[in-house]
Amino acid sequence: MTMDSGADNQQSGDAAVTEAESQQMTVQAQPQIATLAQVSMPAAHATSSAPTVTLVQLPNGQTVQVHGVIQAAQPSVIQSPQVQTVQISTIAESEDSQESVDSVTDSQKRREILSRRPSYRKILNDLSSDAPGVPRIEEEKSEEETSAPAITTVTVPTPIYQTSSGQYIAITQGGAIQLANNGTDGVQGLQTLTMTNAAATQPGTTILQYAQTTDGQQILVPSNQVVVQAASGDVQTYQIRTAPTSTIAPGVVMASSPALPTQPAEEAARKREVRLMKNREAARECRRKKKEYVKCLENRVAVLENQNKTLIEELKALKDLYCHKSD
């Protein structure tokens, strides 16, 4: 029975080997089992689902068919998270680098603060040691207190202008104008004229300002002119002109005294113009009404002349009729 089954297995194995390409391998086993065996694996019938059939030939010529237990490696569905590992390592490296940069920056700031503190304390101690009664500063103030800007009050000097006649004109910040002759010392006891400030306008326009004299009278002057009232009561106006830098030093202005009408004269001139305008309109209306009246009279005269002619003709006709009846 054993020999018959072995012959059948050998015939089927030879048929399988002839149908497909086989791979032979030599396996050396223990001396009590077998010394040399040929293993043939059919590659055509091997699939992932069916077990592999292996033909083992013993040294005595007997062939045995053995079902393989080891299956071929199948491709795995689960992939290894290599990309995630790389990302995690990169993030860890960036965090480490950021921490290292922050630590280096903190150390540099701390080093700068430590290097600056002794210098500030030394300077403050040196300054406080010179003045008696000023305590030494041992603790440094916070950066907000030290960084507060100091407010310094600066007094702007009053500009003083000198005219060609030797008279000094001082213009204060409030808009007041002070005048002084050449013989007075300094600018004390000057005559003051108060002028209102004018807003900035377009070039070429004339700005009028009210100037108040010492007696309380207000006059209207342009913004580029200065009114001067002498001790005798005479009022003079000076026009300030900016001289070119090539002919005169900066800060000195030229003054001239053009004739400027006062406010009452301007008011009288304005009233006179209004009165003349009204008179012209009234004369024009009177001439128009006169022409209309004359034309109406001429029409009436023409009507009366026609009526007179008609009456004369009727009178002649009545006379002729009366003469015939009398005959």
Swiss-Prot record:
On this chain, the residues bearing Phosphoserine are S119, S128, S257
Q: Which SMART domains does this UniProt record tie to the protein?
A: BRLZ (SM00338)
Region (Leucine-zipper) residue ranges read 297-318
Renumbered to this chain, where is the cross-link Glycyl lysine isopeptide (Lys-Gly) (interchain with G-Cter in SUMO1)? Answer: K271, K290
Where is the stretch described as Disordered? 1-29, 94-113, 126-149
Q: Does the keyword DNA-binding apply?
A: yes
Alphabetized, the UniProt keywords read: Activator, Biological rhythms, Differentiation, DNA-binding, Isopeptide bond, Nucleus, Phosphoprotein, Transcription, Transcription regulation, Ubl conjugation
Top-rank taxon of the source lineage equals: Eukaryota
Q: By its UniProt entry, which InterPro entries does this protein fall under?
A: bZIP, bZIP_sf, CREB1-like_pKID, Leuzip_CREB
Supply one GO BP term.
Answer: osteoclast differentiation
Residues covered by the bZIP domain: 269-327
Q: Which family does it belong to?
A: Belongs to the bZIP family.
What is the protein name stated in its UniProt record?
Cyclic AMP-responsive element-binding protein 1
Species assigned in the record: Rattus norvegicus
